Amino acid sequence: GATLTDSAKLLGIFKETQNLTAQQAENLLISTTELAVANNVAPDKILADVAQNTEFFAKFAEDGGENILRAAVQAKKLGLELTDIEKITSGLLDFQNSLNAEIEASVLLGRNINLQKARELALANDVEGATAAVVEQLGSAEEFNKLNAIQRQKLADLAGLEVSALSKIVNKEKEALTLSSALSKQQVDIIP
């Protein structure tokens, strides 16, 4: 779980990478805890996850880091970590490999897969939206369970994840899409 060290580290990250005042950073930490509780996710797990992914936070954070904190909640609801969300986002921004994976998956699955929206969202640092856009393309748990090993691997490659992580996502897809919608309505206020 989160320790005082994690909290102190996060306060420093918020101030250094997002140019927040000490009070704004503290408010962001409090709001993140409230967001986690509101979504039935252990706040200490969210704070620890973000504290362990400082490079990802520095690279993709916007609006004081609110987008990454919401993505951390989304990840936990999917049974994932921020490192998985980073793999998805970074994979989308590797345009050549992302397009190749998209074409291969489309051929192997016999259906059109289009990650253009997900790539655009990732490029705009909308980590949460990019993840939701990828989830929308994966198909249902029922469809996933009918796939053979090669098809499952190609779908995992498409998402930039291991098959086990992908399996968690498709089994929680409805929850993920509902969560993404709910999170977009919840705001994390960083300014008192």
Please state what every model-predicted region is:
Residues 1-192:
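Amphipathic alpha-helical assembly segments
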